[in-house]
Amino acid sequence: MELPLLDKLKVRDLVDKRFSHLFETVSLLSGDNEEDNEDQLRLKNSIKNLREHLTEKEEEIRQLHDVISVKNRDAERLNDELISINIENNLLQERLTHIQAEYDTLIERWLLKAQREADIMNTRLK
C-alpha cells in the first residue's frame, strides 16, 4: 500500500521540479526601452500561453486516465461474463452428453423390445 503512494509522490515531485524549471522567472534587463517592454510583454504572454496549454494538457491527461479506468472496469466485467458463460457452457455440455447417453440407451432398449416382439410374432406365424 505504501509503495504506490511513494511512487506517486516521486512522480509528483518530478513533475513539480520540471514545472518549476520550465517556468523559472526570466530575469529581464530593466530598461525603459520600448523594445525591452515589448520583449517582456511577449515573454509574459508566452509564459501565460504555455501555462494555459499545460493546464489543458493536464486536464486532458486526467480525462484520459478516467477513460482508461472505465475501460478497465468494463474489460474486467466482460472477462467475468465470459468466465461465467464458459462455466455455464461446460455444465450444459455435460448435461447434453448425459442426456444423449440416456437417449441412446432408451433407443437401444426400445429396439431390443421391438426385436423381441417381432421374433415372438414370427414364431407365432410359423
Curated annotation (Swiss-Prot):
Keywords: Autophagy, Coiled coil, Membrane, Protein transport, Transport. It is found in: Preautophagosomal structure membrane. It is a peripheral membrane protein. Stabilizes the ATG5-ATG12 conjugate which is necessary for autophagy. The ATG5-ATG12/ATG16 complex is required for efficient promotion of ATG8-conjugation to phosphatidylethanolamine and ATG8 localization to the pre-autophagosomal structure (PAS). Also recruits ATG3 to the PAS. Involved in endoplasmic reticulum-specific autophagic process and is essential for the survival of cells subjected to severe ER stress. It holds the Pfam family ATG16. One of its GO terms (cellular component) is phagophore assembly site membrane. The keyword Coiled coil applies. One of its GO terms (biological process) is protein transport. Homodimer. Part of the ATG5-ATG12/ATG16 complex. Several units of each may be present in this complex. Belongs to the ATG16 family. Residues 32-109 form a coiled coil. This is Autophagy protein 16. Its main location: membrane. Gene3D superfamilies: 1.20.5.170. InterPro entries: Autophagy-rel_prot_16_dom.
